[in-house]
């Protein structure tokens, strides 16, 4: 699998995750605008640092890959909000 195919797979996984979370949360990310998304990105970066530094996750159902997919989606959400303004 080449890099383009790998990126397509990541986009596909991220889109499916976005759809599931969007069903649960709706358009909640837009409520607080880009600053709200920045806070969530900061939370995920902290989680990324914690996982990579400690090599363990205390939240068993959230792996490093999940955190990175969330970061991918939060970046996309920020882009959506920027395009709306």
Predicted regions and their residues:
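Intrinsically disordered, low-complexity regulatory regions
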Residues: 1-85
